[in-house]
């Protein structure tokens, strides 16, 4: 994960001070790309401990099409608490867009099911895409999608994925995003009888919050360790039938966690 540390260093050295929606202030760069070969290990940051349980539960929650935090709360995951209303609702965020995008004629489009079918029936298609950026529903969302658009690509029997993230909290959010999409690629590859290829991350406004600078310097002082290995213990009947206990991470030996405030 040296390239993640290189990105942190780049933002510190080249970032432009900018105001932001939260009022916190950032150092920001625009446009950056990283490529992770998923056959080299699972890209989980090792220079601080990442809360993998939250990453897995959040992805399963997205895949279920859920937009209420009740499932997350039941599993002691609090990462969406600050944005939920008094009933735990977040509006039509990721899960709704991925699984039930509303078409003008009233249809609900299951983008993820469509992707599975495309990968099995037409893997060379250049249209194997999922979008969470539904312009007509942005004003109903508790938080507009940060990881907004992703595309799958098959070559030589390997499945790759590229994500476009329009806004990226480099210190807190990005390690989650990388691990979450890497996990999704592994799951999708298993369902479609493919090997894993690359996960390509592309960032738009890529920033460090002003109250994360000290934590970033601490993380940069640490040496990366070997990447862990993801083990999926069974093959469910569909992409939507995975459970938390289906996943093991072997050999994860991170440095201690580093606490930092969330910009809301």
From Swiss-Prot:
Keywords: Cytoplasm, Methyltransferase, Nucleotide biosynthesis, Transferase. It comes from the Bacteria. It catalyses: dUMP + (6R)-5,10-methylene-5,6,7,8-tetrahydrofolate = 7,8-dihydrofolate + dTMP. The keyword Cytoplasm applies. It holds the Pfam family Thymidylat_synt. GO terms for cellular component: cytosol. The active site is at 146 (nucleophile). It is found in: Cytoplasm. DUMP binds at residues 21, 126-127, 166-169, 177, 207-209. InterPro entries: Thymidate_synth/dCMP_Mease, Thymidate_synth/dCMP_Mease_dom, Thymidate_synth/dCMP_Mease_sf, Thymidylate_synthase, Thymidylate_synthase_AS. (6R)-5,10-methylene-5,6,7,8-tetrahydrofolate binds at residues 51, 169, 263. Its EC number is 2.1.1.45. Pathway: Pyrimidine metabolism; dTTP biosynthesis. Its main location: cytoplasm. GO terms for molecular function: thymidylate synthase activity. PROSITE patterns: THYMIDYLATE_SYNTHASE. The keyword tRNA processing does not apply. GO terms for biological process: dTMP biosynthetic process; dTTP biosynthetic process; methylation. Belongs to the thymidylate synthase family. Bacterial-type ThyA subfamily. Catalyzes the reductive methylation of 2'-deoxyuridine-5'-monophosphate (dUMP) to 2'-deoxythymidine-5'-monophosphate (dTMP) while utilizing 5,10-methylenetetrahydrofolate (mTHF) as the methyl donor and reductant in the reaction, yielding dihydrofolate (DHF) as a by-product. This enzymatic reaction provides an intracellular de novo source of dTMP, an essential precursor for DNA biosynthesis. Homodimer. This is Thymidylate synthase. The lineage of its organism: Bacteria, Pseudomonadati, Pseudomonadota, Gammaproteobacteria, Enterobacterales. The gene is thyA.
């Amino acid at each position: 994960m040296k390239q993640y540390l290189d990105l942190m260093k780049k933002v510190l050295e080249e970032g432009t001070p900018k105001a932001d929606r939260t009022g916190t202030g950032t150092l920001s760069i625009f446009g950056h790309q990283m490529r992770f070969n998923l056959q080299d290990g699972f890209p989980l940051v090792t220079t601080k401990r990442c809360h993998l349980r939250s990453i897995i539960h959040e992805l399963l929650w997205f895949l279920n099409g859920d937009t209420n935090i009740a499932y997350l709360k039941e599993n002691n995951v609090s990462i969406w608490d600050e944005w939920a209303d008094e009933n735990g609702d977040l509006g039509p965020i990721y899960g709704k867009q991925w699984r039930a995008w509303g078409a003008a004629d009233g249809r609900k489009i299951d983008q993820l099911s469509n992707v599975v079918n495309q990968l099995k029936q037409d893997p060379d298609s250049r249209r194997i895409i999922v979008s969470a950026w539904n312009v007509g529903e942005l004003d109903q969302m508790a938080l507009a999608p940060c990881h907004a658009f992703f595309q799958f690509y098959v070559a030589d029997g390997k499945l790759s994925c590229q994500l476009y993230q329009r806004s990226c909290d480099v210190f807190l959010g990005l390690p989650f995003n990388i691990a979450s999409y890497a996990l999704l690629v592994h799951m999708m590859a298993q369902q479609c009888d493919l090997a894993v290829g690359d996960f390509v991350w592309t960032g738009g406004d890529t920033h460090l919050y002003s109250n994360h600078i000290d934590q970033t310097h601490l993380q940069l002082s640490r040496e990366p360790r070997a990447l862990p290995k993801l083990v999926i213990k069974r093959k469910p009947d569909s992409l939507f039938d995975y459970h938390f206990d289906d996943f093991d991470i072997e050999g994860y030996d991170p440095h201690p966690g580093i606490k930092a405030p969330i910009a809301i």
